[in-house]
Amino acid sequence: VKIFIDTAKLEEIKEANSWGIVDGVTTNPSLIKKAVDSLEKKISMEEYIGGICKEVDGPVSLEVKSQGAKEMIEEAKKIYNMFNHVNNNVVIKIPVNTAMQDDQENYEGIKAIKKLEEKGIPTNATLIMSPNQAMLAAKAGATYVSPFLGRIDDYIRVKMGLKPGKDFDKGSYFDEKLLEKIRIEKKREIIKEEIKEDIGRIYVDERLKELSADIKSGVDVVRKIKKIFENYKFKTEIIAASIRNARQVMEVAEIGADIATIPFDVIEEMVKHYKTQEGMRNFTKDIIPEYEVLFKK
């Protein structure tokens, strides 16, 4: 699996890159602004983004700000021309669907992806929440698709009636089996309630429809996308995004996701293990004086 680092902090990018583990970077405008604002020595955003592109030889995903296809294409060309010459590694993040409500156009992202790829500008279809969205982005020619694991998990948990901050924290891990047990229990409660009123309502209850949805978790979305892409030989690569803990990284790697884009704190979590620390303590105790002498010669 390739590892991208999901950050705008140049010091984190440089540190992780020095370990030889970074294959690319994903970021967004708000993260970049925070990183620039936190610097003691003030530099322009343009100079800062150029520094990110220079630091990493792999792809660097940069985002557009508009919602219309025409505007996104113009912004993408501008960003690409501004930064790609630095290290020939710029990828443009395009939301797969830019609509913010039901009465807005749903296809602007797909349109922009197609046009940009035809112009030779690589795209990363972002905010992917379903296998269908990933399939359409791949058909349009996207270089990458980014399913958002953490956000999908949050959505599923809330639909099950769990409350953020009370029943789960942002970084907490729920495996599919645990989620399935919760789902079954919730369905039982609703069916019991509906039977008392009218058994026929079971078939139209929106809560039951939501709980019977085919998607089990964010990792499950990656699994389904992977299967579709393999079936139809799509060249589009899968970037598992919105990763919040080390377990998710392990699971998407097991599935065969092409890339996991990981925040720095999760990378730190990946390298830690209590038994490794314990082993190091024992190891240092076991070093005998005769062995230490070898290092003094």
Where are these regions (language model features)?
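A structural motif
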Residues: 21-22, 57, 142, 257
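A hydrophobic, small-residue-rich beta->alpha segment in the mid-to-C-terminal subdomain
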Residues: 263-269
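Active-site beta->alpha loop and helix N-cap motifs at the rims of alpha/beta catalytic domains
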Residues: 5, 9-13, 19-21, 27-109, ...
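Catalytic alpha/beta core domains of metabolic enzymes, predominantly
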Residues: 100, 104-114, 122-263, 276-287
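Extreme N-terminal starter segment of soluble prokaryotic enzymes
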Residues: 1-3
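Hydrophobic residues within beta-strands of alpha/beta enzymes
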Residues: 24-25, 92, 145, 260
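A short acidic, helix-capping loop that chelates divalent metal ions and anchors anionic groups
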Residues: 32-36, 156, 270-271
